[in-house]
């Protein structure tokens, strides 16, 4: 956004991060447009507690994109997506993915609709709804959740959206031993994958869960 330019160092950090993750450098311009829009709106609407654009690159964009190698083409519902994380970065990086951004907060949903419009993301749509109220049972190949509840809680509110054979991809910090043990009957962990996010010191794990 020309009226709210990001420092050159922000673009450099993103480009270096994409390179270290083996992702296409062509993703940088649309990701920076999204970041500039998020930074601008955040000043008024408090969409995220992270204010520094440099930190947003690491903790929002690169963290979201760390799961990209595990996402398949098809349909995906991003539950409790907030301002569109990881859903919008994944929609940018995966043109064969149809992303539904599920968020009940009105101001965050309005921001995402504007971001989708400005970015021309034909493979993303916003569902302003709580996950448990979304009447699209069995509609999705994949569910994602990055900062939403325990594994059992995610399954409880969003499990109905997953088609038979579909998977939940949940981003977690440290290895979630207790959460895995508390999954409802029929839900099984297929894999827990440690993730490396450039510039992020803390542990990150992607938990892949299959339904009954």
UniProtKB/Swiss-Prot annotation:
**Disulfide bond sites:** none
Q: Which domain of life is it from?
A: Bacteria
This enzyme's EC code(s): 2.1.1.170
User: Which keywords does this chain's UniProt record carry?
Assistant: Cytoplasm, Methyltransferase, rRNA processing, S-adenosyl-L-methionine, Transferase
- Where along the chain is S-adenosyl-L-methionine bound? 80, 85, 131-132, 146
Per its record, the protein catalyses:
guanosine(527) in 16S rRNA + S-adenosyl-L-methionine = N(7)-methylguanosine(527) in 16S rRNA + S-adenosyl-L-homocysteine
Q: What is its main location?
A: cytoplasm
Its subcellular locations are: Cytoplasm
Q: Name one GO molecular function term.
A: rRNA (guanine-N7-)-methyltransferase activity
The reply on keyword Transferase is yes
Matching entries from Gene3D superfamilies are given as: Vaccinia Virus protein VP39
NCBIfam families, alphabetically?
Answer: rsmG_gidB
Q: What does this protein do?
A: Specifically methylates the N7 position of guanine in position 527 of 16S rRNA.
| Protein family membership | Belongs to the methyltransferase superfamily. RNA methyltransferase RsmG family.
Protein name as annotated:
Ribosomal RNA small subunit methyltransferase G
């Amino acid at each position: 956004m020309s009226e709210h330019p990001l420092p050159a160092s922000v673009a450099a950090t993103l480009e270096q991060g994409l390179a270290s993750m083996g992702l296409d450098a062509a993703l940088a311009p649309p990701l920076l447009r999204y970041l500039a829009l998020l930074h601008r709106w955040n000043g008024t609407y408090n969409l995220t507690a992270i204010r520094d654009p440099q930190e947003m690159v690491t903790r929002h964009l690169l963290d979201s994109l760390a799961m990209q190698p595990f996402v398949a083409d098809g349909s995906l519902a991003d539950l409790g997506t907030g301002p569109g994380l990881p859903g919008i970065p994944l929609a940018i990086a995966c043109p064969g993915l149809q992303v539904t951004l599920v968020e009940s907060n009105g101001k965050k949903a309005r921001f995402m609709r504007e971001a989708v419009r400005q970015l021309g993301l034909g493979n993303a749509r916003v569902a302003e709804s709580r996950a448990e109220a979304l009447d699209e049972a069995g509609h999705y190949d994949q569910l994602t959740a990055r900062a939403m509840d325990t594994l059992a809680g995610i399954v409880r509110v969003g499990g109905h959206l997953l088609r038979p054979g579909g998977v939940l991809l949940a981003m977690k910090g440290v290895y979630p031993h207790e959460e895995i043990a508390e999954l409802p009957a029929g839900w099984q962990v297929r894999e827990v994958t440690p993730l490396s996010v450039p510039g992020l010191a803390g542990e990150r794990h992607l938990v892949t869960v299959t339904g009954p």
